[in-house]
C-alpha cells in the first residue's frame, strides 16, 4: 500500500504541506482489499449511490456535521457570506457563497486567473501530461472531449487541472472574460478524484460525468472549460447564462457534496503559466491556490 500522505505546495507560504485525507479508512478499504475494489467499482458506476448521499446531505439533520467539519479542516467561517447557523443542511454549507473580499480577482486583461480553490497542476504542453500519468495510465484528449475536431485544436496546446477536495470552496468561476457558450454534457461514471485514487487511474477524467463549455476570449482565444464530477458529486450546477458575456472571476456554477475537478484547455501559444506552478508541476507536486489568483499571462510573441 502506497503512503496515504499526499504533499502539495502552499502557494501563499511556499511551504510543502501534507493534505488532510478525507475518509482515509474507506480509501484504504477500496484500495487494499479485493472486496473493497469490487464495491468501489459498483458504487462509481451506479449513480444511485451518489444520489442517495446527495439527498441525505440535504436533510436538515445534517446541520450537526457543519461545525465539526469546519473545525477539523480549519475552514475560515468568516469568509462565508452567511453565518454557520443560517445553513439549513450540510450541503447548503458545502455550496456556500463567499464574501467578495474573501477572493479578490487578480486584475489586468492579460492575466488569466485560477477558476476555483483547489490543488493545481499545469502543463505548458499537453504532450507532457503523459509524463505525469503514472502506472501506465495514458491521457487521451480525444476521450476527454469526445470531439475529435476539438481535440485536434488543442493537441499542441496547454492544460491546467484544479482538483477540489471536500473541504474546499466548491463554487467555480470564469478564468477570463469573454462569451461563454452552452455547456455540453457527457454522461459517465463517478469515480473518486481523491489524490490516491488518481495515482491509480488518471483516466477518470475521461470516464467521469463532465460538462464542457467553450469561452471565446479576446486575450486568450478559445478556452475550453471542463467540470468533472466525482463520487458523491454527480450534480454539476451551472449558474451563468449561456451565450452571454462573462467577466473574469464571475461565478460559473457549483458542485454538490464531495470532491471534484476543473480542467482548462488553451490553444497553442495563448498562455504562459506562472513560473511557480510550472516548477512545482514538473516535480509532480500540486500547488494549492485560491480562486482569483494569477494562473498565467497572455502569450506575446
From Swiss-Prot:
Cofactors that this protein relies on: pyruvate
Keyword terms of this UniProt record: Cell membrane, Decarboxylase, Lipid biosynthesis, Lipid metabolism, Lyase, Membrane, Phospholipid biosynthesis, Phospholipid metabolism, Pyruvate, Zymogen
EC number(s) from the headed UniProt entry: 4.1.1.65
Catalytic activity: a 1,2-diacyl-sn-glycero-3-phospho-L-serine + H(+) = a 1,2-diacyl-sn-glycero-3-phosphoethanolamine + CO2
UniProt xrefs under InterPro entries: PS_Dcarbxylase, PSD-B, PSD_type2_pro
Note on how the cofactor is bound: Binds 1 pyruvoyl group covalently per subunit.
Main location: membrane
Subcellular location: Cell membrane
Single GO biological process annotation from the record: phosphatidylethanolamine biosynthetic process
Pyruvic acid (Ser) PTM positions: 260
Residues carrying the site annotation Cleavage (non-hydrolytic): 259-260
Assembly and binders: Heterodimer of a large membrane-associated beta subunit and a small pyruvoyl-containing alpha subunit.
Described purpose of this protein according to its UniProt entry: Catalyzes the formation of phosphatidylethanolamine (PtdEtn) from phosphatidylserine (PtdSer).
UniProt family annotation: Belongs to the phosphatidylserine decarboxylase family. PSD-B subfamily. Prokaryotic type II sub-subfamily.
Name used for this protein in its record: Phosphatidylserine decarboxylase proenzyme
Amino acid at each position: 500500500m502506497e503512503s496515504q500522505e499526499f504533499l502539495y505546495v502552499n502557494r501563499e507560504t511556499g511551504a510543502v504541506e501534507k493534505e488532510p485525507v478525507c475518509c482515509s479508512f474507506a480509501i484504504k478499504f477500496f484500495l487494499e482489499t479485493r472486496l473493497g475494489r469490487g464495491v468501489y467499482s459498483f458504487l462509481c458506476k451506479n449513480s444511485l449511490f451518489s444520489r442517495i448521499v446527495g439527498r441525505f446531505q440535504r436533510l436538515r439533520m445534517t446541520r450537526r456535521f457543519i461545525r465539526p467539519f469546519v473545525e477539523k479542516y480549519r475552514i475560515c467561517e468568516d469568509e462565508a457570506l452567511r453565518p454557520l447557523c443560517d445553513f439549513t443542511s450540510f450541503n447548503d454549507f458545502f455550496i456556500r457563497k463567499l464574501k467578495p473580499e474573501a477572493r479578490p480577482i487578480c486584475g489586468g486583461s492579460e492575466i488569466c486567473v485560477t477558476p476555483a480553490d483547489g490543488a493545481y497542476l499545469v502543463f505548458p504542453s499537453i504532450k507532457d501530461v503523459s509524463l505525469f500519468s503514472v502506472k501506465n495510465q495514458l491521457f487521451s484528449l480525444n476521450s476527454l472531449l469526445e470531439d475529435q475536431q476539438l481535440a485536434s485544436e488543442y493537441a499542441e496546446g496547454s492544460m491546467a487541472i484544479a482538483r477540489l477536495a471536500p473541504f474546499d470552496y466548491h463554487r467555480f468561476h470564469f478564468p477570463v472574460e469573454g462569451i461563454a457558450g452552452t455547456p455540453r454534457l457527457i454522461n459517465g461514471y463517478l469515480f473518486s478524484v481523491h489524490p490516491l485514487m488518481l495515482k491509480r487511474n488518471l483516466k477518470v477524467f475521461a470516464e467521469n460525468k463532465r460538462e464542457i463549455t467553450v469561452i471565446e476570449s479576446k486575450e486568450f482565444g478559445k478556452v475550453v472549460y471542463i467540470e468533472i464530477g466525482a463520487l458523491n458529486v454527480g450534480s454539476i450546477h451551472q449558474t451563468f447564462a449561456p451565450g452571454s458575456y462573462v467577466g473574469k472571476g464571475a461565478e460559473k456554477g457549483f458542485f454538490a457534496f464531495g470532491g471534484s475537478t476543473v480542467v482548462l484547455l488553451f490553444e497553442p501559444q495563448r498562455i504562459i503559466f506562472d513560473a511557480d506552478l510550472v516548477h512545482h508541476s514538473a516535480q509532480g507536486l500540486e500547488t494549492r491556490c485560491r480562486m482569483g489568483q494569477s494562473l498565467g499571462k497572455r502569450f506575446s510573441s
